[in-house]
Amino acid sequence: MGSNYFNSLNFRQKLIQLRQCTLIRKEEFSETFKILKGKNIVIVGCGSQGLNQGLNMRDSGLNVKYALRKNSIISQRSSWKRAIDNKFLVGTCEELIPTADLVINLTPDKQHEHVVDVLQNLMKKNSILGFSHGFNIIEFGQKIRQDITVIMVAPKCPGTEVREEYKRNFGVPTLISVHLDNDCHNIGLEVAKEWATAIGGHRAGVLHSSFSAEVKSDLMGEQTILCGLLQTGSVLCYDKLISQGHDCHYAVKLVQSGWEVITESLKHGGITLMFDRLSNTAKIRAYKLSNDLKKILSPIFKKHMDDILSGYYSKNMMLDWKNDDKQLKIWRRSIQNTSFEQCSISHITLLEHEYFENGLLMVAIIRAGVELAFEIMIEAGIKEESAYYESLHELPLIANTIARKRLYEMNLIISDTAEYGSHLFFQSAFPLLQDFMNTLEHGDLGNKMLDQAINNVDLNYINTTIRNHPVEHIGQKLRRYMTNIKQINCY
């Protein structure tokens, strides 16, 4: 096992890297591709990110090939089929890597140690190695040959959305970075900008970040609000609805589709718009519930952040990798056996407003999780831009996966790294929230809250507090780059 790169830095260096996150002006991007045009680009791996980034890059006029394992080619596995069906040239690493100018490693995190060792031995002098997640560099601490430039382009969404937004002549917000230990030719940033442009990221906003900031914020977001809290909230809300006597198909429909419908409002107006979709009475109640949830969940969120920063989380997960994912598989089976996952498909139709009216608790969970994750990342030294993308921005995208095939789909789409952290969060949060669930009132979940007399002073205070939260301010700034973002008819 390598030596954790982040832990090798002194305190000052850690803060500098965590705080690295600057929005790049649109004028700095060009679709002429002065560096990458005509260059030989090889993507290693053809999963969701690999395929869809490659399609976008080819449509942008770049030369893209795929390097796969020999067994994958001989056995004609799904990765080979995806590449061939889309008319890409496919070969082994031994065949394609020695002549590549840019090698993009888009294999799963747990394979990086071996894959990167193979790539380094094959890459030509002064070539470029790219990643879309910095886990291997930061947490495992793998050393890369000094003549190789190491860069990262990390789209802030699943690979399918990278492609869909590109086809709409738009893109998805993207983080780019250059590994400070591997930029001897001082070309890393310009190459990363061209790669980000080739996949359409420049149309939605590109942030110049660091490997450390991307990894630490990404791990925190996916473990807590993005995956961990949605998974915990799904099981808790479904079980509560059943205990109240609701039909299982109504319960599963409200929860499974509710996350997607409710978080759709976040894309266009943040938490402010989400709360504005509630009646005044419901807004006051949701505000109280979300504050209660923040107090309960704060210690868990802080522990996850602390363990991510120290490397304790990654160390334990990598030990589980070496144990054939034993713990991950146990947790995975446990979630698959929950009543929420086992309920048959629901054919009930609910109108959009019913999800807000009957899912008040879900609104409260979302606000609590987004604000808490954002606040704790800021406390840790992470910049507001990074914290926003890893708390609020990606939430609707993860909710979309639950709407398709519940938690099974979410855990299938996200990385094993994200899934491990999500299950770890569930183990702590689920039992901790049991007492809270027993305090819920009629109208909090499954039933519409009856309107009551409103205190204008209280309502004004709540509206002002929500709108003035830092996540709302930075959200307004960053969403200006996403005015063309598509609206999903998700109910």
From Swiss-Prot:
Active site: H133
Residues annotated as binding Mg(2+) 1: D218, E222
A single GO BP: L-valine biosynthetic process
Matching Pfam families: KARI_C (PF01450), KARI_N (PF07991)
GO molecular function, one term: ketol-acid reductoisomerase activity
EC number(s) per entry: 1.1.1.86
Domain KARI C-terminal knotted: 210-354, 355-485
InterPro entries tied to this protein: 6-PGluconate_DH-like_C_sf, 6PGD_dom2, KARI, KARI_C, KARI_N, NAD(P)-bd_dom_sf
Cofactor: Mg(2+)
Record text on cofactor binding: Binds 2 magnesium ions per subunit.
Domain KARI N-terminal Rossmann: 18-209
Xref: PROSITE patterns: KARI_C (PS51851), KARI_N (PS51850)
Signal sequence coordinates: none
One GO location term (cellular component): cytosol
Record keywords: Amino-acid biosynthesis, Branched-chain amino acid biosynthesis, Magnesium, Metal-binding, NADP, Oxidoreductase, Repeat
Residues bound to substrate: S415
Residues that hold NADP(+) according to the record: C46, G47, S48, Q49, R69, R77, S79, D109, K110, Q111, G159
Catalytic activity, as annotated: (2R)-2,3-dihydroxy-3-methylbutanoate + NADP(+) = (2S)-2-acetolactate + NADPH + H(+); (2R,3R)-2,3-dihydroxy-3-methylpentanoate + NADP(+) = (S)-2-ethyl-2-hydroxy-3-oxobutanoate + NADPH + H(+)
Pathway(s) per entry: Amino-acid biosynthesis; L-isoleucine biosynthesis; L-isoleucine from 2-oxobutanoate: step 2/4; Amino-acid biosynthesis; L-valine biosynthesis; L-valine from pyruvate: step 2/4
Binding-site residues, Mg(2+) 2: D218, E390, E394
Family matches, as Gene3D superfamilies: N-(1-d-carboxylethyl)-l-norvaline Dehydrogenase, domain 2, NAD(P)-binding Rossmann-like Domain
Family (UniProt): Belongs to the ketol-acid reductoisomerase family.
PANTHER family to which the protein is assigned, alphabetical: KETOL-ACID REDUCTOISOMERASE, MITOCHONDRIAL (PTHR21371:SF1)
Known function: Involved in the biosynthesis of branched-chain amino acids (BCAA). Catalyzes an alkyl-migration followed by a ketol-acid reduction of (S)-2-acetolactate (S2AL) to yield (R)-2,3-dihydroxy-isovalerate. In the isomerase reaction, S2AL is rearranged via a Mg-dependent methyl migration to produce 3-hydroxy-3-methyl-2-ketobutyrate (HMKB). In the reductase reaction, this 2-ketoacid undergoes a metal-dependent reduction by NADPH to yield (R)-2,3-dihydroxy-isovalerate.
HAMAP family: IlvC
Name of the protein this chain belongs to: Ketol-acid reductoisomerase (NADP(+))
Organism: Buchnera aphidicola subsp. Baizongia pistaciae (strain Bp)
Gene name of the record: ilvC
